[in-house]
Amino acid sequence: MYSQVNGMGLFGMNAFKVTAEIMSSRGQPSFDIVGLGDLAVQESKMRIKGALSGIGISVSGQRLTVNLAPADVRKCGSLYDFTIIAAILAVNNIITDDLSGCAFIGEVSLGGSLVFTGGIISMAIEAKKCGIKRLFLPAENAKEASVVEGLSVYGISHISDLINHFAGKKRISPEPPYVPSAEMFETEDLSDVKGQALARHALEVAAAGFHNVLLIGPPGTGKSMIAKRIPSILPPMTFDESIETTGIHSIAGMLDREKPIVTVRPFRSVSHTASAVGLIGGGSIPRPGEISLAHNGVLFLDELPEFDRRTLETLRQPLEDGVITISRAQGSVSYPCDIMLVTAMNPCPCGNFGNPKGKCTCSQNMIQNYLGKISRPVLDRIDIQVEMPQLSYEEISSAKKGEPSSAVLERIMKAREIQQKRFAGTEIRSNSKIPPSYLHEMCPMDENAKQMLSDCFDKMGLSARAYDRILKVARTCADLSGSEVIRRQDISSAVNFRSLDRKYWGAGK
């Protein structure tokens, strides 16, 4: 006897349809699984036998051959357990319904319970594209998958529930579509920040255009404090951004099962002890790293020179492309990483280099070695560099509150609305992602701005990349002012935001 049942596979974020073909024939009892499955797939035989025997179904006396098609694609993990069990139930006529429009996903325990499975939303989206109408999966994953429109999702707690459902004894109702809503959450407010007007303005520009930022200054000037308040001025996530981010967090097993859709932009603060694998992802089965977990949000690297230089160098390509590709023998996996990189650092090991209120105890060689841990190509990818000086006693002791995040966010939202209209019909989401081919069209300058940028290019020895990034930051400054064209003052602001590489790292970019 022959039967086939649909399932879904996953490698990285790449979901694909899998067909479990099963043949029950006469002969020496056996249970074989073919189709390029890994060790976890082969071990599923014991889980499946145990789960079925627990409800009085024995496969020990049968000769079963299961093929997971397509046979040339590597199958990794335990999520095929439920697919194979459904195929066994179908070939033994325990389930007699037409299953051609159904798909079954999930790991099954020895007791027959379905286990929470990561990466469900990616597989649910692909299942719909493949024409699947009904999706059966672990009950704990049902809410996550139900966000996909046009797909009936059935949460199954135990394989006996599946049998009773198709037998008509106890029908399972489809999971109601989950409609995510923007969460109201407590964030630290910019009004807590004393002084630092330039840094506040820099973060406003950065949040409006999704630009990368470097904060540099002596210890105790509030670099980390102000960075941690960035989430309070970031625009809400769109639905598409939310689904993208949820897919990554689902694979990483980081979703809240009660609120399985990420609706708040991530803020990932990474320790300087992080490895390259921890930062960009990796492993035998590639998992997303911190840069991908921060997708559509903020990646914060404090004490930047304390990171291993080789680790920082791995950021160069993903910062440029917005995607990280990890290659393994069984294939390549790509994870999106469209992030706002925020970094903070002291200007030297003791922290007082260039500080008029403190004495630097570092030698010139120590300072050069410290700053040299950040390569010029990495520095060139940071659009906005801002110095945070030590505060005066009057600034620290003042009871006056700074401008609240809500007022700053209001201006940022207006700038983002301008960008949305500008980028309508394209895949561009923010000024920082304008490709070179669109720069001339989307960043028009008046004559004064052109002349100033030309002068700066010659005097500062700017690279082509730095030129592009200055233009993008100037575009954001103009948007915040409501100007359609980039003016001289916008170029001036953007150039000033790149002046620290001359002060601390020598010649400009």
Language-model features: where?
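Short beta-strand elements
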Residues: 18-24, 279, 383-386
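Conserved alpha-helical scaffold flanking the Walker A/P-loop in AAA+ ATPase domains
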Residues: 204, 260-261, 266, 276-299, ...
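Walker B catalytic acidic pair
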Residues: 296, 302-303, 314
